[in-house]
């Protein structure tokens, strides 16, 4: 049995990964198959996720569009009039910035796919402004399985933006994504999932076989925030023994996991906009609504402090 301290790491903080590679990076963490990542592995992995309709992983990649007034109205019309049919329209975020005099729209890949899929089935044509067809064709792995796109050209126009193109704090808060991998225990990971506007992924105890050599045939637990005492060690070792006994009897990992302790290590990935992170820090690092759990604060406070240091224009006023 290993005992480690909790920690966090950024995933693609500088937004240099392609959407496909970022989806693969997060997705493989769930199955602990990061060793299979190569320069060409993203395409078959992402296509496999889509074919199996494992769309949750698509939420960790964000695409941002600049839009003219007419283009924004067209997209808004679809979201407002057909909210129930499209699903996830609230995940398509919008800002109008007087400084840049532009509309900005952003969403994760799952939300964009829902919008495209519904539009093509409803209108037979893709009822979107000029520029959107090229945007979709630029990502054939992500959108190529949907109905053939025939763009209904209107007066509006859209163009793709990157996070570095976001100028004002308002745009950054609404559209800039930040993905963080937390190495915490199962209890803290469960608390993180309560932030429902964020997207989540985590190492799965259904598929991670701790009796396998990949894990050293042992479990890893997170040390308590205060101190490690004999009772904690004994309880964790007992859980490990019972888990291994279940596996040796032929029980699958998804059944044997019922023996695991809440202190078992979990790698949990969380993607949210900077605005959402700001609200999360307010609750989990700064105790705005009461004292945060010590083990949650143990990772959230240093993460918040690093974000303040690197992005003071966004986080300096939390």
Model regions and ranges:
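Family-specific signature for flavin-dependent thymidylate synthase
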Residues: 1-318
